[in-house]
Structures are given as C-alpha cells and as structure tokens.
C-alpha cells in the first residue's frame, strides 16, 4: 500500500517539499532547537499556572456556577490537557526532531494537540454565542444544565477528531537527520490535504465567522441602546474592549498557522509554489505554532483575569481561606511552643534530679 510520510514538522501537517529545496536548513534547525523549546517552556509555565488557578477558583465557588463559567472551566481544562504535552515537544525540538519517549507518547501527545485545536475553539465559540444571547436577548433561557450537555458534546467531537492522529501518527527513523521522528504516516497522499482543509474550516474559519458575527451584533446592540449609552458608558467600553480582545486574540494566535497549513494542503493538491515559498512556510511554521499555543496561556488572562467576576471570586476565596490558614498556622505555632516548653521542663527536671545533693563533686 502506498504511504505518504509527513516529516516536516511534528505538529504541523506538511510534507517534505522538493529535494531541490533545503527545507530543514541548518539555520532553520538551529533556531528551532534553541528558541522554540524556550517559548514552549514559557507557555507551559504561564498557561499551566493560569489555567489551574481558573479551575480551582471556579470549582471552589458554588455561587458562580453560570453558563459562561461552565464553558470557562472546560476551556481551561482543554488548555491544561494540551499544555501537559508541551514539555515533550520542547524536548523533541531541542534534540533536533528526535523523539525519545516511545510510540504511545507520540500518539497521545499528538492526540492532545488535536483535542485542544477543536475543543478550545468550540468552547470559545460557545462563550461568544452565550454572551450574544445574554446581551441581545437577556430574557432568553440559558441553563447551566444545557451548557454542560453542550460541553459533553464538544468533548466527544474533540475526542473523535483524534482518530486519524491515533491511527497515522507514529515514530519513524529519518536517515538524513539521523533521528527517530514523531510523524504522520498517511495511507495515501489525499489524506493530508483533506484533513488539513477540514481543520482549517472546522477549527478556524467557521468558529471565527460565528464569533465575529456575535460580537459585531453585540457592539451594534449596545451602541444602539440609549439606556446603555446614558447610564452604562463604562460597561459599554469594558464590553467592547473585551469583544475586540477576544476576536483579535483568537485571530492573531491561529491565523498564521492555518494560512501556512492551507498553503501546504494546496501544494499537495497540485498547486505549484516557488522554492522560496516552501522555505518560508517551513521557517514560519514553528513560529506560527508558538503563536497558536500561546492562546492556551492567554485565555486565562483574557477571559478571567481582566473580568470583574473572576477577581471578586479570587478575593473572596482568599478571604475565606486566609483566616483558616492563619488559624492553622497559629495552632501549629502554639503546639510547637507548648512542645518546646514541655521539652525544656523535662530537660531542666532531669538536670536537677541528677545533681548531687551537696551541690559538689
């Protein structure tokens, strides 16, 4: 059976271009080996802490179990799952495309990326639709139970989307680089462009179109409502700033990656590009991946830390936990002091008992 080997980038969906193009040039390899692992490590640390804090705060607060928070927690969980795979990819890049973690880890890390690509953008889209309904149609029914059902459906779709990754991703020796890479090995050449175009459409174009539509209508609704303009100007400014941030962050983080993978799919379908274009795509792919992955670290700040509700809940949680921690600390200090006094008394008592009664030798 004919097979098509994807070896240009472990996380992208490109094939190696023409032999005349030095796709993995020494310059590209050096900056990938040195800079990409640093970016991945930074994204992992920032995103892991941020998403863990989001999950802890919202799960601890039973009073704020809303539709929006349901999607926020699931979004944070999706980002957190993917971020757990970033250290593996960082090591992979630092070792020059040499995968040392085995076949199972290769498949699982690839699957976590695929899950995040779809789950993350679907949860962001659901949040956009929920905000649209809350502002434009405030009397419409929005239940937490319904949001949980939608979240389960999103997770199922995201997991199902990993079937091609689990089937085709595997370790494969690359003799020209003298490494064992974690790559996609397709049954034939049509699999790669078809899966890439599906990812471009379902994972970017449609969600971005829905988000842009929702937020443009929210903006028009707020600006066209006299009561909001007269009494809630600050609220309008805050919402509009959030709208712009949401749309721009998603677009800027993932647009470059999807454009580059789209060009790769077109090339595989027979569209001819110059050698310089192929080299540019190969050089920019790791950078575009860093941008896309940074969305997982930005999300907690974008959706939570700039919002009043999250800050209020974080402060409330701190106020609830701080007295308990203080009490525990005081209790431990008291016990230690008591223990020290008792130990001192025991030592003094033992010394007195051992002294000769005449006070001398």
Question: What positions do the PLM features span?
Answer:
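Loop architecture of class A 7-transmembrane GPCRs
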Residues: 17-27, 99-114, 137, 143, ...
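First transmembrane helix
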Residues: 32-59, 212
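Helix-to-loop junction signature of class
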Residues: 40, 44, 57, 82-96, ...
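Alpha-helical transmembrane segments of multi-pass membrane proteins
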Residues: 44, 74-86, 114, 151-162, ...
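Generic structural signal for small/hydrophobic residues in well-ordered secondary structure
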Residues: 51, 58, 108, 156, ...
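Intracellular effector-coupling site of seven-transmembrane GPCRs
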Residues: 182-189, 200-204, 220-259, 278-281
């Amino acid at each position: 059976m004919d097979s098509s080997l994807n070896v240009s980038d472990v996380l992208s969906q490109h094939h190696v271009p023409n032999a005349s193009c030095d796709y993995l040039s020494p310059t590209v390899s050096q900056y990938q080996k040195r800079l990409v692992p640093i970016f991945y490590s930074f994204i992992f640390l920032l995103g892991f802490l941020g998403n863990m804090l989001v999950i802890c705060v919202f799960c601890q607060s039973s009073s704020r179990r809303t539709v929006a928070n349901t999607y926020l927690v699931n979004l944070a969980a999706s980002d957190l799952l993917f971020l757990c795979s970033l250290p593996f990819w960082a090591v992979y890049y630092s070792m020059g495309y040499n995968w040392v973690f085995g076949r199972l880890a290769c498949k699982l890390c690839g699957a976590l990326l695929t899950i995040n690509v779809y789950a993350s953008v679907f949860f962001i889209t659901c949040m956009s639709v929920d905000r649209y309904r809350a502002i434009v149609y405030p009397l419409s029914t929005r239940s937490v139970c319904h949001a949980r059902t939608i979240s389960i459906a999103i997770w199922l779709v995201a997991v199902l989307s990993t079937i091609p990754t689990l089937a085709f991703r595997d370790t494969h020796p690359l003799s020209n680089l003298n490494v064992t890479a974690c790559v996609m090995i397709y049954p034939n050449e049509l699999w790669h462009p078809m899966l890439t175009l599906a990812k471009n459409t379902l994972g970017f174009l449609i969600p971005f179109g829905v988000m842009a539509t929702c937020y443009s209508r929210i903006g028009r609704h707020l600006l066209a409502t006299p009561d909001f303009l007269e009494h809630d100007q600050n609220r309008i400014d805050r919402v509009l700033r959030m709208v712009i941030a949401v749309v721009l962050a998603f677009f800027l983080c993932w647009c470059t990656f999807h454009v580059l993978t789209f060009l790769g799919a077109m090339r595989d379908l027979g569209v001819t590009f110059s050698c310089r274009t192929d080299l540019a795509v190969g050089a920019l792919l790791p950078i575009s991946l860093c941008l896309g992955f940074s969305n997982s670290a930005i999300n907690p700040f974008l959706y939570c830390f700039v919002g009043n509700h999250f800050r209020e809940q974080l402060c409330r949680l701190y106020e609830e936990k701080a007295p308990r921690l203080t009490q525990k600390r005081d209790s431990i200090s008291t016990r230690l002091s008591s223990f020290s006094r008792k130990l001192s008394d025991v030592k003094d008592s033992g010394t007195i008992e051992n002294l000769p009664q005449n006070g001398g030798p």
